[in-house]
Amino acid sequence: DTDDPQWRAIYEKRCKDEGFTAYFDYSWQWAYQEKFKEAGLTAILGSGFDPGVTSVYSAYALKHYFDEIHTIDILDCNGGDHGYPFATNFNPEINLREVSANGSYWTDGHWVETKPMEWRAQYNFDQVGEKDMYLLHHEEIESLAKNIPGIKRIRFFMTFGQSYLTHMKCLEDVGMLRTCLLYTSDAAD
């Protein structure tokens, strides 16, 4: 449970002690929201592609093409394996945490949580063909739920190949995707 303060403190300390930067928490970015508003500036959460560009596209579409937007489905697809049996397209630790965490989506004014990888759908992408995609929680849906008036549903899906899923399952089976403390025996001095 990443909201558990004790767990978060232990995890943050471990990351800082080891020099890791994979710990992600956008609360420090959200804290600037009012300051940016007061200054008349636009800020984009995360500022990558998703989140980032997807939020800009959504806001642009609302401003220039639609009176209202009721549904946003973000489909994050890439077929890249970089020639390896297991590869991620960004920081592996963050990627594996996103995929192994509970999913969620916004519908009719509230959040619905799903089990990790519970929702699978297929979609035929013009350039790369039909892919399996899975509903995940992703931070831009939080910002879109707040900033797109009248939105009824927002979901985020990401595609994964079978080799990626097989390797992820192996990591999960040996406990490497756990986010809770694991004790194997009583501590002794």
State the predicted function of each range:
Residues 2-90:
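Glycine-/Pro-rich loop/turn segments that contact NAD(P) or position catalytic residues
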Residues 63-185:
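C-terminal catalytic/substrate-binding lobe primarily of soluble NAD(P)-dependent oxidoreductases
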